[in-house]
């Protein structure tokens, strides 16, 4: 079978469990990017299965996700008005960023997206914090636990956990309080414990699994739409993500939305 860049495929050796897009081909090797999970991979061409799936289906699934969350959030708009928290989303992947920004728009949230390489986040993040003055900041992109590595406690054994951790630390220099600025950090298989120790309110990945492209955005949206100074049910919040507490975790956190009266 002849494959080309842009084709949607699955991998036979992994029981065709995840959907990827081919982003490059060299000789007999295809370089892949996950459609739903924040994951890069490579594969021999003869291990790939072509998938005739339209990306419009994924957009429909995202809209269904929005509808599901909106039904969970009961806001009395007859007498009260609401000012949700502002979101700053830094993402190492342009496609995932665009998908998350579309998600925020569907949720009627004020969100600013920055496509930036993970290695540059530490140096650049303060500039964006000062410009947008967010209530919630997301630090994400791509990550993975390196092949052959054994110690899951060391950031050096991850593709980008060190970059995410340093960006979180820089953010905490800007705002020390975990109540005033909510940080959501990490990507697939990230070093969860180090991100939490660095100052993140929420992070991936407790069980070092892959996370869904929208998981950080789901948490950010629910925090943005929860009343300020009211603690959010942590377990319920985490379970709203695609893989639950295996993929995302965090600390008890209050919402960022102001509630006003009269409307």
Predicted region positions:
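Short beta-strand-centered aromatic/proline hotspots
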Residues: 16-27
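Proline-aspartate-enriched helix->loop->beta-strand connector
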Residues: 129-142, 200
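Intrinsically disordered, low-complexity, charged/polar segments
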Residues: 36-81
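Catalytic cores of nucleophile-dependent amide-cleaving enzymes
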Residues: 163-211
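Short helix-loop-beta junction
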Residues: 101-112
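C-terminal functional extensions of proteins
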Residues: 207-263
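Short, solvent-exposed secondary-structure boundary/capping segments
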Residues: 28-36
């Amino acid at each position: 079978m002849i494959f080309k860049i842009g084709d949607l495929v699955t991998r036979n050796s992994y029981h065709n469990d995840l959907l990827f897009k081919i982003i490059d081909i060299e000789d007999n090797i295809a370089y892949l990017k996950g459609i739903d999970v924040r994951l890069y991979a490579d594969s021999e061409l003869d291990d790939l299965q072509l998938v005739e799936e339209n990306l419009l289906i994924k957009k429909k699934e995202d809209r269904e996700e929005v509808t599901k969350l909106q039904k969970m959030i009961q806001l009395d708009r007859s007498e009260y008005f609401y000012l949700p928290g502002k979101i700053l989303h830094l993402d190492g992947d342009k496609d995932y960023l665009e998908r998350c920004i579309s998600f925020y728009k569907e949720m009627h949230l004020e969100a600013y997206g920055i496509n930036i390489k993970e290695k540059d986040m530490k140096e650049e993040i303060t500039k964006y914090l000062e410009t947008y003055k967010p209530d919630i900041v997301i630090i994400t992109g791509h990550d993975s636990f390196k092949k052959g590595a054994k110690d899951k406690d060391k950031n050096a054994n991850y593709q980008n956990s060190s970059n995410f951790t340093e960006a979180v630390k820089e953010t905490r220099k800007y705002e020390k309080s975990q109540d005033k600025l909510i940080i959501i950090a990490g990507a697939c298989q990230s070093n969860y414990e180090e991100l939490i120790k660095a100052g993140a309110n929420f992070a991936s990945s407790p069980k070092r699994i892959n996370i869904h492209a929208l998981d950080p955005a789901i948490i950010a949206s629910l925090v943005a739409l929860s009343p300020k100074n009211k603690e959010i049910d942590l377990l319920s919040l985490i379970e709203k993500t695609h893989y639950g507490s295996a993929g995302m975790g965090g600390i008890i956190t209050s919402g960022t939305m102001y509630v006003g009266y009269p409307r």
